[in-house]
């Protein structure tokens, strides 16, 4: 348990609140529903509350490698995965024999037993486990690992270890300094219009440098790649093309399968399982541009603290982890919860769109459809059309401006994003991006 003394100060509206709150369990009891917090002592002000706890206590590993019965050396036996994607030999798995040794199989069996017993893995164990599974490419083993991890409940250490293993084999986009991503875990089942995609375009129109990652739909009618393709954005760009789009147009999109060849091994298993796995949580951490800043939406309020601690441990310069009324993004449905993550600390604040003059809406107001339908909606909203979807884009773009330090408060971000959205400037950003992406494709 981590016990901390909380202080409050608001970056929601620029109002400075000060004072000492009572001591409380800072990480284990955090939850929120539509902006209402059940945290002891937090309700100093109905919609503007914040608390702080030490990052040292928040992210220190709960057990070290010396305590584990399953070590990285168990997986020294490895071979080239046969994954295209441009990663160097130095980034590949350690070289050894063509097939897994009996000792590594035995060790992995021991790991499976520990998961059955609901014992958490260390960060190193999780990383080594995924390296072994990618090398073996055995669907039965991958399925067992993912299901048992989900049944036990993934820890932030496990999430970080798995993310490190994935990034070892990622195709990187270099040189995008101070870029931001707006990304969600998905899995909320709401089938809304592509809010994070539209928000990314709006944030770019506001001056942010956006390096967005995404994929085609897996759980909804239209994924980010689907709607961007319908809009005319070229998806199959290499690192130089992405860099050109971001530097010249303010925004670029990295198609996950192109940049994470290891997903060719894990992807088929996930499709067959048809359940949420740790890869739903991992996605936001796997940006090939290794962005400094991110707005990360999570589909369940219980994941907010876990994701915040994982992002901090992973080395994110600053991130906002958000959840609002069952959605993996900020929305006008109601209030929500945000964790502000930096290397030094993790702070929580609640927000309510009403404080920014944004009225409530229903889920039906945000409902999307197929790629062509969603593309048409986004074009209208980016051209200046008002309504619930415009309000959603404004909220999330404002969060991106805040996390990348382009504004000082969420309220200031909302003001900037609202002015740009209503002016129709964002549609020019989209059209410019489409043009640059097509030019970049021709020069590949």
Curated annotation (Swiss-Prot):
It catalyses: N-(5-phospho-beta-D-ribosyl)anthranilate + diphosphate = 5-phospho-alpha-D-ribose 1-diphosphate + anthranilate. The gene is PAT1. Anthranilate 1 binds at residues 184, 215. This is Anthranilate phosphoribosyltransferase, chloroplastic. One of its GO terms (molecular function) is anthranilate phosphoribosyltransferase activity. It is found in: Plastid, Chloroplast. The keyword Transferase applies. The keyword Acetylation does not apply. Belongs to the anthranilate phosphoribosyltransferase family.
């Amino acid at each position: 348990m981590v016990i901390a003394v909380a202080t409050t100060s608001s970056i929601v509206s620029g109002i400075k609140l000060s004072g000492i709150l009572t001591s409380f369990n800072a990480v284990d009891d955090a939850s929120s529903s539509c902006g209402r917090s059940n945290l002891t002592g937090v309700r100093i002000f109905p919609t503007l509350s914040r608390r702080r706890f030490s990052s040292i206590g928040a992210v220190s590993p709960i057990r070290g490698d010396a305590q584990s019965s399953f070590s990285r050396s168990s997986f020294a036996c490895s071979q080239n995965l046969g994954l295209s994607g441009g990663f160097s030999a130095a980034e590949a798995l350690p070289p050894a024999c063509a097939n897994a040794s009996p000792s590594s199989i035995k060790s992995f069996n021991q790991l499976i037993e520990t998961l059955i017993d609901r014992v958490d893995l260390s960060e190193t164990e999780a990383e080594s486990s995924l390296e072994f599974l990618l090398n073996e490419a055995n669907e039965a083993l991958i399925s067992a690992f993912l299901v048992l991890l989900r049944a036990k409940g993934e820890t932030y250490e496990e999430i970080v270890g798995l993310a490190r293993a994935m990034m070892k084999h990622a195709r990187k986009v270099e040189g995008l300094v101070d870029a931001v991503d707006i990304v969600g875990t998905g899995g909320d089942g709401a089938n809304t219009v592509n809010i994070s995609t539209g928000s990314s375009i709006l944030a770019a129109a506001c001056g942010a440098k956006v390096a967005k990652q995404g994929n085609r739909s897996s759980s909804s009618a239209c994924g980010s790649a689907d709607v961007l393709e319908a809009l005319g954005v070229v998806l199959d760009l290499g690192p130089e093309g992405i860099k050109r789009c971001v530097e010249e147009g303010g925004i670029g999109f990295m198609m996950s399968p192109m940049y994470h060849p290891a997903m060719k091994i894990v992807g088929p298993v996930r499709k067959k399982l048809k359940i949420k796995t740790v890869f739903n949580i991992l996605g936001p951490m796997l940006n090939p541009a290794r962005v400094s800043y991110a707005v990360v939406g999570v589909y369940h309020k219980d994941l907010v603290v876990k994701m915040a601690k994982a992002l901090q441990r992973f080395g994110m310069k600053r991130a906002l982890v958000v959840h609002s009324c069952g959605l993996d993004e900020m929305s006008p449905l109601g209030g929500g919860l945000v964790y502000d993550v930096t290397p030094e600390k993790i702070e929580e604040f609640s927000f309510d769109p009403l404080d920014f003059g944004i009225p409530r809406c229903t889920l039906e107001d945000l409902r999307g459809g197929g790629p062509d339908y969603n593309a048409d909606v986004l074009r209208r909203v980016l051209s200046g059309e008002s309504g619930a979807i415009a309000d959603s884009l404004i909220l999330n773009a404002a969060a991106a401006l805040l996390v990348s330090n382009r504004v000082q408060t969420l309220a200031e971000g909302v003001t900037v994003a609202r002015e740009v959205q209503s002016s129709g400037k964002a549609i020019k950003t989209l059209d410019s991006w489409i043009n640059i992406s097509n030019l970049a494709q021709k020069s590949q």
